[in-house]
């Protein structure tokens, strides 16, 4: 299936379904993907299909490019709603991610004070003190929790290394509400196994995890672009709405993208 890589170190701005006008920051090189997950729905493709043989971008490279782009956008009269650290893989795995965040906050305050800073992360490095501290600095700390079922995590997200969902929930809770939980709901089949996390056996325990984490918000979405594997399909809008209503019943705001 058709997938794509982002430009580096800056891409966009693009109109995000969830974030508005988003200026992307890519800690990874443009030539490949570096991720601690290998999600079968990833718009950047599977890891093996996008091998990367270059190092992560340094904070200096990222910040120089970010400053230039913000100045260009200011001159054109349209600054981004959000500066989003995302790109071709897991941004928090970059060695100089904390320095890049600290510098981006300074640039934002100077050049685009009304813009938010967001990080889209799978959360696998969020327990590291320097990463945790950096994520506390951003406006939207968006961490992924697609399910709490260990077997389904292995099928859907395919973590590259050890992954303990209980540890992840505890880590996410340690942000004391300064976290947005992002979850994809989808249906289909992969390797002869059903892909569907919309049923009660998945939704119920996921809601229980949200109660423990107490995020400032949850954002749920479904497949919007082509995926690297065949056989995946959108969750129905009415299913997403029903899940969102249950999140909201917990006192947690929930944003839905169909």
Question: What function would you assign to each model-found segment?
Answer:
Residues 1-18, 50, 64, 71, ...:
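Auxiliary Fe-S-binding modules of radical SAM enzymes
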Residues 83-88:
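Short glycine-rich or small-residue beta-strand-to-loop segments that form or flank ligand, phosphate
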Residues 18-64:
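Canonical Radical SAM [4Fe-4S] cluster-binding loop centered on the CxxxCxxC motif
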Residues 15-16, 30-32, 109, 146:
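Short polar/acidic secondary-structure junctions
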Residues 32, 90-91:
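Short strand->helix junction
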Residues 22-24, 82, 142, 180:
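Short hydrophobic-acidic sequence motifs that mark active-site Asp/Glu residues
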Residues 45-82, 95-99:
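Conserved alpha-helical substructure of the radical SAM core
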Residues 93-233:
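Conserved AdoMet/S-adenosylmethionine-binding subsite of the radical SAM
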């Amino acid at each position: 299936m058709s997938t794509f890589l982002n430009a580096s170190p800056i891409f966009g701005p693009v109109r995000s379904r969830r974030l508005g006008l988003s200026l992307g920051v890519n800690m990874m090189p443009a030539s490949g993907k570096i991720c601690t997950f290998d999600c079968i729905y990833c718009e950047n493709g599977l890891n093996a299909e996008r091998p990367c043989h270059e190092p992560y971008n340094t904070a200096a490279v990222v910040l120089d490019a970010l400053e230039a782009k913000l100045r260009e956008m200011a001159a054109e009269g349209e600054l981004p709603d959000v500066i989003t650290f995302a790109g071709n893989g897991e941004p928090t795995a970059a060695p100089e991610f904390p320095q890049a965040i600290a510098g981006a906050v300074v640039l934002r305050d100077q050049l685009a004070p009304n813009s938010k800073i967001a990080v889209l992360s799978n959360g696998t490095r969020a327990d590291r003190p320097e990463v945790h501290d950096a994520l506390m600095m951003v406006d939207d700390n968006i961490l992924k929790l697609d399910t709490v079922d260990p077997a389904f995590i292995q099928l859907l997200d395919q973590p590259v290394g050890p992954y303990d969902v209980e540890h992840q929930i505890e880590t996410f809770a340690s942000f004391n509400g300064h976290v947005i939980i992002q979850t994809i709901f989808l249906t289909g089949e992969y390797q002869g196994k059903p892909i569907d996390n919309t049923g009660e056996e998945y939704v119920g325990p996921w809601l229980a995890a949200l109660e423990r984490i107490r995020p400032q918000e949850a954002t749920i979405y479904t497949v919007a672009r082509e995926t690297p594997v065949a056989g995946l399909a959108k969750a129905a809008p009415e299913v997403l709405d029903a899940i969102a209503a249950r999140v909201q019943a917990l006192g947690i705001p929930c944003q839905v993208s169909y």
